[in-house]
Amino acid sequence: MTYTVSIDVAAPAELYDTFHAALLKHTGGHVDGLLAHVAWPTAASFRIIEVWTSKELRDRASRDIIPQVWATLTATAPGPFDAMPVEHVEELDTCGLIIPSADLAV
C-alpha cells in the first residue's frame, strides 16, 4: 500500500528551488518512506506529487524535517524569507506505481 499526495504551494518556483537544494543538503536525498517526489511550476505557484510508503512517514517528515530545513534556510540564506508557505494537500488514490530503477511495482 502507498500514500500519495498532491501539494499546491502558493509561492514562486524560485522558492521551491532554494528550499529543495536546502532539503537535499539536509537529508542527503533520503527521507524515510519517500518513494517518489516530482515538482513543477504552475502559473502562480508550484505543485508537487509525492508517493510515500505510509501516511505516518509523510506526516513525520512534514512535522520534523520540513520545519527544520525551513528554519535553517531562513537563518542562513540571503533573501526575504517569511513564514513557511501554506501547503494545500490533497490525498490521491493511487492505482499503481512502477519504479523500475528501484525494482518497485505496486
Predicted feature locations:
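Short S/T/G/P-rich N-terminal loop/turn motif that feeds into the first structured element of a domain
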Residues: 1-71, 75-106
